[in-house]
Amino acid sequence: MEKMQLQNYHVHYGPAQGWSRVDLRELWRYKDLIWLFVKRDFNVMYKQTVLGPAWILINPLMSTAMYCVMFGTIAQLSTDGMPQILFYLAGTALWGFFSSCINKVSGTFTTNSNIFSKVYFPRLAMPISTVISGLINFLVQFALFFILLLVYLAKGEVSPHWGMLLLCVLLVLQVGLLGLGCGIIVSSLTTRYRDLMVVVTFGVQLWMYGSPVVYPLSMITHPVLRAVMVINPMTAPMESFRYIFFGTGQVTGVMWASSLIWTALLLALGLSLFSKVEKTFVDTV
């Protein structure tokens, strides 16, 4: 009888290597865990608060009121003829979604190190759940915005392009991916450089004032500043959002090309850094 030769098989459990780290099928298998993280985020965010989830609407309304006073009444910045409350609420809601993606995703490794060190699951599930949480908040705020939009539509003060609503869906998706890319880049770097968390908060605020959030792009006439605004990846989404729902805004193919290129590059860089850091971050956090 021939001797059976046994081969040694080594089974490795842990994160995949390099670009194979982004396994969409694996993430789909962990979809229940992702939703569990989403629920956890909401529970933690509104735990022991008097108004609870009502803060989802209160925060943008307070910001909108402040912008109406500061930029509309005192600074008297143009809103391209649009009602101030609609103009600022639109910018606040969309930018709030983007900034929450960056700020919350940037703490992925530092705030979840205890979970990561105890059990294996696709680490990318954590930042994705954060983006989904931000998206849910945005949708609630968008519902409020849409109700106000219908009020001003009945008055004849806005002219939405209803045929472009599908573009709005793609626009929000692109903003989420851009925020995810920026966030995971920062989260990967903060495993070694904790100071970045402080810098990011200031940087995101500075980025907001460098984007057409509280003012329209039409206000920027200086050639150099205009060029900077064009390559800003958040300019195209902001102006397109207003163009779809207000009928105003300056959008060009160059703006969208720049925005999509930046989104792709930052997301690719973020995923690459994330896949490298997740293997060793426990030793550095």
PLM regions and their residue ranges:
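Hydrophobic transmembrane alpha-helices and immediately adjacent juxtamembrane helices
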Residues: 1-285
